[in-house]
Amino acid sequence: MIGQLSASVPVFSGFKIHNSIAVQENLYQAEMATTSQTKDEIALRVIDYYTRLYKAQKRIELLKENQKSAQQRVKDFIELEKNGIIPRNDLLKSQLQVSKIQLNLDEINTNLKIINFYLVTLLKLNPETKLEIRESDFADFEITTIPTNDHLAIENRKDLEALRFQGKASEANIKIAKGFYYPTIAIIGGYTALDLSNVITVQNAMNIGVGISYDLSTILKNGTTVKLAENKFVEVQNSEAMLMDYIKIQVQKSIEDYDLSLKQNVVFSEALEQSAENYRIIKDKYDNGLSDTNDLLEADVEQLSSKINNALTKANTFQKYYELLSATGQLSQTFTISKN
């Protein structure tokens, strides 16, 4: 009867075990950063659809108001044309304006339905849900910090963080590949029990030692593996450099867009007052026979355009502000994304 037991415990393997753990830890962190970046992108899409939905609803509201006054003008012009006070051409112009308003309403209503569907789908709501955006959401929203450079983006962007962790994982992979150039050292132990009837009996024989092994074929082939690992590391570094350049451009554009929206707030507010006063003057002149229908309709269109621009400017600033936060990696710090 014979019984044997042997065991080998590696004590050195070219740091491959240590670096393999580092690879997995860094890849895990890269995946977590990518997940956070995806959440930020989804949040920004929700904000975009939310703002576009409000803009569509507000346009419809203002167009319907304008449509009522335009339809009333047509009724007045019909009577004036019957009495020979205005030419038929003026009546046709007023009717054409009503038709244009209706076409705009139809187009915006279609866009409204599409945007609403996109948003409820993204939010996992019932497809039949009709969302109504409150104007106060845009009028009362608070601006906390305004980024003025790309420093925060370099620190906070999760897509950049993911690439950095991938770079660390690639560095560890290079070390793993180079680890095959080293021998494997292990502590080897054994136990033997031997009983040959009437010949020999060995009980509790134990041995312990150190084993060193080299795989020469692996060493000869390992140069290619090392080069591949190094090329992967360079590729990740290049991707990181390209992303940093893109982030800097994106941040600068977002800063400029936000500043422009603030300037537009002032201009559109002034334009609203100017267009209202212009329409009042033109209407007064028209009633006194000092201006024609073209002037009246043009002033009406300008006033409508000013109303729309002024009504949407706060929503535009709201959108540009959150785009700036997203570009600088601060969007997730502004609110919490949750799923019930």
Question: What is each of the regions a protein language model found here?
Answer:
Residues 8-37, 161, 180-206, 213-227, ...:
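Small/polar (Gly/Ser/Thr/Ala-rich) solvent-exposed segments
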Residues 41-154, 254-257, 261, 303, ...:
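Periplasmic alpha-helical coiled-coil/stalk elements that build and connect Gram-negative outer-membrane
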Residues 38, 42-61, 79, 115, ...:
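Amphipathic alpha-helical coiled-coil segments
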Residues 1-7, 149, 206-212, 254:
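Hydrophobic, lipid-facing positions within transmembrane beta-strands of outer-membrane proteins
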